[in-house]
Structure formats: C-alpha cells, structure tokens
Design a protein with these regions (language model features):
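Juxtamembrane intracellular "pre-TM" segments in multi-pass secondary transporters
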Residues: 1-13, 189-221, 395-402
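Hydrophobic core of transmembrane alpha-helices in multi-pass small-molecule transporters
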Residues: 21, 89, 100-116, 297-311
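Loop-to-transmembrane helix entry/capping segments in MFS-fold secondary transporters
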Residues: 45-46, 131-141, 326-336
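C-terminal transmembrane bundle of multi-pass solute transporters/carriers
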Residues: 55-71, 76-85, 92, 240-406
Length: 406
C-alpha cells in the first residue's frame, strides 16, 4: 500500500482517525483549560503542570498492571468506554468550586481508565490495515496527532480568552462524547484478539514473554532510549530560549510531520528497514551544535532537521510488529507506549538536573551525545544479533524471529 487514496479506501480507517482526532482535540483543549483553572485556583505552576500531565503518569501505572486487556477485550467497546469515561470525568472537573484534591482524584481515575487506550488503538490499527499498509497508516496517524495538538492548543488558547475554563472543559467533554459516538457507529464489533481474562498476572506474563526475545528487546530499546534522551533536550526549550520556546516547539512539530510523511509515503520497504539507525542519529546529531549556544534562527533549523529523525519510530514499530504474534499486537504496542512515556519522563528529569548543574545549552548537548552513544551501541548489538541468527546450528533461546538488523 503506497498511496493515500488506497489507504483511505481501507474500510474503517477513516472513522478510526476521526474518532482519534476528536479524542485528541478534547485532550488538548481540556488539558489547557484544566491547567489554567488549577493555576488560577492555586497559583502553583507545579500543580498546574501536574494537572495537565498527571493522567499520563497514572496511565503509566495502569498499563504496568492492566495491559493484558489490550488483546483480551473487544476493542470497539473499550475505546467507546474510555471516551465516555473521559467525558464524564471532564464534566465533573467543570463543576464550580471543585476542591483541588477532587480534581487530582478524577485525573488519577482518568489515567487508569486510559491505560489501555494506546495498546487497544495500536492493535486495532494493526487489524484494520494490511501488513504492507501499516507504516503509511501509522504515519498518517502520527501526523494527525501532531496537527491536532497544534490546532487544539491554539484553539484552546483562543477559547480561554473568550470563555471561562469550566466552559472549555464542557466543550472538551462534548468532544469526548463525539469520539465515543464515531467509534460506536464507524467501527466494526471485533472479538478480542487473544483468549482469556485480563489480569495482573497475565500482564506480567506477556510482558516477560515479549521481553524474552533479544530482537524484540533491542527493538524496544531502540524505540525508547534515543527518543527519550532527545525529548529531554526538547524539554529545555523554555529555559534555553524563553521568548522563542513556542517557535522551537512549532519547528519540532514541522520536522516530525515531514519525517512521518516522507518515511510513510516515499521510502520503499526495502530501504525502510535499513534506515532506523541513520534516522536515530539524525534525531540527535543536530543538537550537538547547542554547545555553541546558537541564535534562535539556527536553533530552529537544527530542531526542524533533528525532528525528522522521530520517523525512526515508524520503522521500528513496523519491525516490532514483524517480531510479534498477531494476538499480542495490542499488548506489544501498549508496552512500547508505556516504555516510551517512562523514558521520556526520565529524559526530561535528567536534562533538567543537568541544566541546574551546568546550563540548558550544555545539558541539551550532553543529552544529544547520550542519544548518539545509545544509537551506536544498539546498532552494534543489532549487527551481532544478525550474525548470530544467520550462523548455522541451534541458537540460545530458540528464537525463530528475524534479527533486529539496522
């Protein structure tokens, strides 16, 4: 599948995207409104930030224990239920005079409910698309996410200039209801991909199974570590250039859009499997110039070029799917989303600590150097695994999957 026309003719792909766009728009508009509401109520930038990103942290905890449900529950029902739960929770958040403790209790519940969302959506996308259409379809999904974030934050900011935060939260709740409706009417009722009941023990057993394969381990590390270290650099835009942080983030979004479009649409599969390492190096190398503390214009160019390298995620996700049984696709993608969120959080914390001890520019450079080092190390390990798998005779662990070659 090499054309957008063929992609959008795929049954259910368009309603899948529309439901996701409505959900993402609700998240951005609602998150900005809630952060503003908490800041006005408490005067605390910390509580405001946690109110916006707290559900993601709770989602990380929930996915650690509940991820087996991504393949053991019917996807349409789960996605509709998640959207309805967010609509109800966001409506509660809009209630006047709601105590801050109650706000964070609702956010915790929302995060736990959403812990299945990434795995269920990823597995459903894998079901909807053919194998040769996954990268193109995922690239459009990623581009839509970036565009929706930019439009959602811009729209949310404009709405907050005209309306009070509770009114914006009610608008977000309506968008969640729209996402649930589109999911219910536009998607087919599929059975679970895997038999059995979701449980904590099943989650841990499947996590262990996915991690037991060395090619999959290398693929997961390639998805998480270089990306997380560079996101640490990204987190320092505000302290590096307070007056131009928005410009740098916009340039990063532009680079991601270009990279996803190019890799998903223009790069043939025979080439795609060989460019994971070059793309991961591209993701980090331009940040090395920050050691010279470049002006905003040059910084914007470096950020734009570097962000094209985020398209490595498409290549590595395609590899992950080739290494994973279809009945574990949702769990495997959910584990990827969980690990990536964790490593990005670690990267941001590490970068902030380095910036406190040195300077934002030095910290960004060090994080980029760490990303380059991790990419080179993983490439060497991948080559060793490729040679080991190609050697005659039995291999330790009895792996039958292809090696994680770069």
């Amino acid at each position: 599948m090499r054309s957008y026309r063929t992609l959008f003719r795929t049954p259910e792909y368009t309603p899948f995207l529309l439901s996701f766009a409505a959900f993402a728009a609700a998240q951005t508009i609602g998150g900005l409104a809630l952060g503003t509401l908490v800041l006005r109520a408490t005067g605390s930038p910390l509580l405001s930030a946690v109110s916006m990103f707290g559900p993601q942290l709770a989602q990380l905890a929930g996915a650690t224990f509940l991820l087996s449900g991504a393949d053991r529950l019917p996807p349409r029902a789960i996605l509709s239920g998640i959207a309805l739960a967010f609509a109800a929770g966001t409506t509660v958040l809009a209630l006047p005079g709601l105590p801050v403790r109650a706000v964070f209790a609702v956010l915790l519940l929302q995060g736990l409910v959403a812990s299945l969302g990434g795995g269920v959506r990823g597995g459903l996308l894998n079901d909807i698309l053919t194998k040769d259409g996954y990268v193109l379809g995922r690239s459009v999904y990623n581009m839509l996410w970036g565009l929706t974030q930019m439009a959602g934050f811009a729209t949310g900011g404009a709405l907050l200039a005209l309306l009070p935060p509770p009114a914006c939260l009610l608008l977000a709740a309506a968008l969640y209801l729209l996402a649930a409706l589109v999911t219910r009417l536009g998607l087919t009722a599929r059975p679970p991909r895997s038999a059995g009941r979701p449980s904590i023990s099943a989650t841990w057993r499947t996590n262990a199974l996915l991690w037991s394969s060395r090619p999959r381990r290398l693929t997961y590390l390639g998805l998480w570590v270089p990306n997380g270290l560079v996101v640490g650099s990204d987190s320092l835009y505000v302290s590096y250039a307070p007056g131009a942080a928005g410009t740098l983030y916009a340039c990063g979004a532009l680079g991601m859009f270009v990279g996803d479009m190019a890799v998903g649409r223009l790069v043939p599969p025979s080439v795609r499997r060989r460019i994971a390492t070059p793309l991961r190096l591209l993701l980090a190398v331009p940040y090395l110039c920050f050691v010279l503390r470049p002006a905003v214009a040059l910084s914007a160019v470096a950020v734009t070029v570097a962000s094209v390298g985020f398209a490595a995620g498409l290549v590595l996700q395609e590899r992950l799917m080739s290494l994973t049984p279809d009945d574990l696709a949702g769990h495997a993608l959910g584990l990827h989303a969980t690990g990536m969120a964790a490593l990005q959080g670690v990267g941001a914390a590490l970068a902030g600590t380095l910036a406190q001890l040195t300077s934002p520019a030095t910290a960004m450079t060090l994080m980029a150097a760490g990303s380059v080092t991790s990419t080179v190390s993983l490439a060497v390990l991948g080559r060793q695994e490729e040679r080991r798998s190609a050697a005659p005779g039995p291999h330790p662990g009895g792996l039958s999957e292809p090696a994680a070659a770069d």
